Amino acid sequence: MELESLFSRSDRLVLFDTETTGLAYSKDEIIEFAAVVLERRDDKVQVMETYDELITLSPGGFVPAMIEKLTGISNQDIRERGVPKTRVCCDIARMFAGNTLLLAYNAHFDLSFLFYMLLRDGDVTILKGKDKLDLLTVYKDRRSYPHKLCNAIEAYGLSDKVVNSHRAVDDVLATVKVMKAMEAEKDDLARYIQLFGSHPTYGVDGKQIGSVTYKPQYYDPMQPLYEL
């Protein structure tokens, strides 16, 4: 069955992506959160929910010009369509509840931003005890540099199906396709659960996630990270 190794230990998979005002986890803010919820029903993997919301900013917060250029999300978009952080945090808690595996492409980045948003406006304990899988770490073991999501889309022949637009909803839909292509290529995704690759020279960007094991990951590894 599709994604058998992941569903053998989890009841639900939640793939997610964020767009943010910058790169500083504790200072910048999430402006868009998107997720795809997968569950196994009648021995088939089904999409149970596709979620996408723009998020209001704290007083004085704004979308920098370079972020608007990258994502197409403007300050006006946030004012007119953004929903409160507290509401998004409640939705995240609902999606993440139970025996759920959390997946993202560059998961350390997205989880770090989620941590601080949940800490301020929700229930950060929802992240505690959750298995986490970083598909960027998997891709770095599969292909040579560069390792952006757009590179994975091209490598797996998905350019006519999905797009890396730097909008969270597009990127998370692309991540779902990339994950399935990765599993079809080699069924070892479960071995990357709670294992994130880190920069071999600079280490982890920001604070480590307590439940995750970090190992230095080189651009052209001779063997999978889980065998080191």
Model-identified regions with their sequence ranges:
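Short phosphate-engaging motifs
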Residues: F109-D110, Y145, A174
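Buried hydrophobic packing segments
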Residues: L114, V138, T175-M179
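Acidic two-metal-ion nuclease catalytic site recognized across multiple nuclease folds
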Residues: M1-S5, K177-L228
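Acidic, divalent-metal-coordinating active-site segment for phosphoryl/phosphodiester hydrolysis
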Residues: R167-A181
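Short alpha-helix plus adjacent loop in nuclease-associated cores
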Residues: D131-H147
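Hydrophobic/aromatic-lined pockets within catalytic cores
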Residues: L118-L119, R143, G157, K177-A184
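Short, glycine/acidic-enriched loop or turn micro-motifs at the edges of active sites
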Residues: T20-G22, T137, A174
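Conserved non-catalytic scaffold segment of RNase H-like nuclease domains
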Residues: M1-G129, C150-H166
